[in-house]
């Protein structure tokens, strides 16, 4: 049972600016929010005075290699696993775990176990089954069964247009989308195909063919959309047709940073409610030469999410900055109670200072960071 908490005098961005509010959280949810909850009497109530501070929804990151990505540079290039305190420090209260290039030593069973472990430690977590390989890699040997039987699975990941993918045909990808759609109908999950994009625009030819055949565009979710000029041009067109596109905050955007990609998309007519962002955290950040040979490798951080929020807030306003990693992604993935501050929503909250730096984090009503210090850590963290 979580301890009831009253956050007073906060400037609330829900993500829309609401002004000064008191927020009462109990049982992991937001129970009340008013201009003043003075006089509230609840046994065991803890009161936090947030005067001068900002309260926002926790961030949602739909693309973290929680078991570690990488491997493209040989045995020593396998990226390390994520630990719980990294989520806390980055203000990521909800995440989707994902696998990548390595379909040999990174099993989907291990991914599921890691997601469930992070959930036990306090975060909200889901996952994409499979990886870059085709045929898809699943626990149950069926995409439909995967969504039907495993609550954490919201869809399947594939890779297209990348020299590391299996180059499935349009018909093969369409079959995956069809299976995901049916499974989504049966489970109420919607069902998505989360698509790692490489540098080749052929991916969007496949998407166009699938949509033309009658399958709804909402099931196709491309990520890393700003990695190449031609790919981004096609991605913007895809979004203007009603699709969602996901910009990577952790780098790999040809025009600069994720905020640059966001601005370019909006300037080119992409609706803001069709743009999400994710970190690609703990994935490898390989650098290849023109011959396709890897010449360098790094590990993606999830701190790039809050850094992107800060940059977008400098350019625009805090509501604009928060949307791609709060309300928009929650609505895109049909995550009820996530990405918003309203009565009945999950108590996943951040307290920010005037510079939009994270000082306090709440996951499901549990305070995990206080005054910049992580106070709830993972099972094996000191």
Regions found by a protein language model. Give the residues of each.
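C-terminal cap of metal-dependent C-N hydrolases
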Residues: 10, 30, 331, 341-382
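Divalent metal-coordination and catalytic microenvironments
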Residues: 10, 28, 52, 63, ...
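Active-site core of metal-dependent hydrolases
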Residues: 164, 172, 179-288, 294-299
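Short amphipathic alpha-helices and their capping/turn segments at secondary-structure boundaries
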Residues: 43-51, 142-147, 258-271
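Histidine-rich, glycine-flanked metal-binding segment
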Residues: 1-5, 11-56
């Amino acid at each position: 049972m979580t301890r009831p908490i009253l956050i007073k005098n906060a400037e609330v961005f829900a993500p829309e600016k609401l002004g000064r509010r008191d927020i009462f959280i109990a049982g992991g949810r937001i129970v009340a929010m008013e201009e003043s909850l003075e006089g509230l009497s609840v046994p065991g109530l803890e009161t936090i005075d947030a005067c001068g501070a900002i309260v926002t929804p926790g961030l949602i990151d739909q693309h973290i290699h929680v078991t570690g990505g990488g491997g493209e540079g040989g045995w020593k290039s396998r990226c390390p696993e994520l630990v719980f305190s990294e989520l806390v420090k980055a203000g990521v209260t909800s995440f989707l775990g994902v696998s990548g290039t390595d379909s040999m030593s990174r099993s989907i069973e291990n991914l599921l176990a890691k997601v469930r472990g992070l959930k036990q430690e306090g975060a909200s977590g889901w996952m994409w089954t499979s990886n870059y390989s085709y045929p898809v890699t699943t626990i149950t040997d069926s995409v439909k069964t995967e969504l039907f039987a495993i609550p954490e699975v919201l869809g399947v990941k594939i890779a297209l247009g990348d020299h590391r993918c299996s180059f499935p045909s349009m018909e093969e990808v369409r079959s995956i989308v069809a299976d995901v759609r049916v499974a989504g109908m049966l489970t109420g999950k919607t069902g998505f195909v989360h698509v790692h994009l490489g540098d080749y625009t052929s991916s969007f030819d496949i998407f166009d063919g699938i949509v033309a055949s009658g399958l709804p565009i909402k099931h196709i979710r491309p990520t890393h959309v700003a990695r190449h000029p031609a790919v981004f041009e096609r991605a913007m067109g895809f979004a203007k047709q009603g699709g969602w596109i996901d910009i990577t905050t952790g780098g790999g955007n040809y025009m600069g940073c994720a905020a640059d990609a966001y601005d370019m998309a909006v300037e080119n007519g992409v609706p803001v409610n069709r743009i999400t962002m994710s970190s690609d955290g703990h994935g490898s950040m390989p650098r290849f030469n023109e011959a396709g040979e890897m010449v360098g490798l790094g590990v993606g951080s999830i701190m790039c999410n809050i850094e992107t929020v800060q940059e977008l807030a400098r350019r625009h306003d805090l509501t604009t900055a928060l949307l791609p990693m709060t309300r928009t992604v929650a609505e895109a993935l049909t995550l009820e109670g996530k990405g918003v501050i309203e009565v009945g929503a999950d108590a996943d909250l951040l307290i920010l200072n005037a510079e939009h730096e994270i000082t306090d984090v709440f996951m499901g009503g549990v305070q995990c960071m206080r005054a910049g210090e992580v106070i709830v850590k993972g099972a094996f963290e000191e």
